[in-house]
UniProtKB/Swiss-Prot annotation:
Organism the protein comes from: Staphylococcus aureus (strain MSSA476)
InterPro entries documented for this protein: ECF_substrate-spec-like, UPF0397
UniProt-recorded name of the protein: UPF0397 protein SAS2570
Primary site of residence: membrane
Family classification: Belongs to the UPF0397 family.
Membrane-topology annotation of the record: Multi-pass membrane protein
Keyword hit for RNA-binding: no
Pfam families: ECF-ribofla_trS
Subcellular localization(s) per the UniProt record: Cell membrane
Keywords: Cell membrane, Membrane, Transmembrane, Transmembrane helix
Length: 184
């Protein structure tokens, strides 16, 4: 089996992606009124980075970005949700493997595929895994954390569905379409 190294491009993408994730997570959020639950723009950006650079970059961007955001905001990380940010980044990257954004195409079919995938991924991560980890790690009350999880899942589905789709479409549109250049 051939060993695959992580490219410099991927490492740089993780670093820049994590930094942007922190900035968006700290300064571009809309409070919902429910404790520790906001409309997050950072996950739409995470979907873009993950779709472009793949599951590993998504995993690391989500983990590092969320951990730094928590440390700079609260003084410590809420590890159950940090882990889920990594998982969701990996899932966005896995979904992105089928999109082929570098071809310059992000069709209606691709948008539907992306959005069905991100809806399923967000429900699994935020409505199921994060609250369960909150109970196992922090002994949090189930009704509180599952309510937070469901609200977060719905808000992330909306944010990624709108902002993420726009970002992916804009990125694909900036790529040179295959076969668009002809020799004269």
């Amino acid at each position: 089996m051939k060993k695959q190294d992580i490219s410099v491009k991927t490492v740089v993408a993780i670093g820049i992606g994590a930094a942007v994730f922190v900035i968006l997570g700290r300064f571009v959020v809309i409070p919902t009124g429910f404790p520790n639950t906001n409309i997050e723009t950072s996950y739409a950006f995470l979907a873009l980075i993950s779709a472009i650079f793949g599951p590993f970059a998504g995993l690391m961007t989500g983990l590092v970005g969320h951990a730094i955001k928590d440390f700079t905001t609260y003084g410590s990380a809420w590890w159950s949700w940090v882990i889920c940010s990594g998982i969701i980044g990996c899932l966005y990257g896995w979904i992105g493997l089928k999109l082929n954004l570098s071809s310059g195409r992000f069709s209606r079919k691709s948008m539907i595929y992306f959005n069905i995938g991100q809806i399923i991924a967000n429900i699994i991560c935020w409505a199921l895994i994060a609250p369960t980890l909150d109970i196992l790690i922090y002994n949090e009350p189930a009704n509180k954390v599952y309510t937070q999880g469901v609200i977060s899942a719905v808000l992330n589905i909306i944010s990624v569905g709108i902002i993420g789709t726009i970002l992916l479409k804009a990125y694909a549109s900036s790529q040179i379409k295959k076969g668009s250049l002809r020799k004269e």
